[in-house]
């Protein structure tokens, strides 16, 4: 197994983890139903880009 040769300092450990932070999800309000949804996704009502594309699940 691989074993570190030297102890990694707290500073270097934290610098290594600097890109692991979670970012907030980008949600938008659907203009047809008024519910929150992810961009470029079909809403729960089955609408995409103002048109009904699937049957409603709610």
UniProtKB/Swiss-Prot annotation:
Superkingdom classification of source: Bacteria
Keyword Heme: no
One Pfam family cited in the UniProt record for this chain: Ribosomal_L32p
Any one Gene Ontology BP term: translation
UniProt KW RNA-binding keyword: no
Keywords: Ribonucleoprotein, Ribosomal protein
Single GO molecular function: structural constituent of ribosome
GO terms under cellular component: large ribosomal subunit
Membrane-crossing residue ranges in chain numbering: none
Signal peptide residue numbers: none
HAMAP family with a match to the protein in the record: Ribosomal_bL32
Family assignment from sequence similarity: Belongs to the bacterial ribosomal protein bL32 family.
Designated name of the protein: Large ribosomal subunit protein bL32
Source species: Anaplasma marginale (strain Florida)
The organism's taxonomic lineage, starting at the top: Bacteria, Pseudomonadati, Pseudomonadota, Alphaproteobacteria, Rickettsiales
Name of the gene this protein is made from: rpmF
């Amino acid at each position: 197994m691989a074993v570190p040769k030297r102890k990694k300092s707290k500073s270097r450990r934290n610098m290594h983890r600097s890109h692991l932070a979670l970012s907030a999800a980008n949600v938008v309000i659907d203009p047809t139903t008024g519910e929150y949804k992810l961009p470029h996704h079909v809403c729960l009502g089955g609408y995409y880009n103002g048109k009904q594309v699937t049957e409603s699940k709610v």
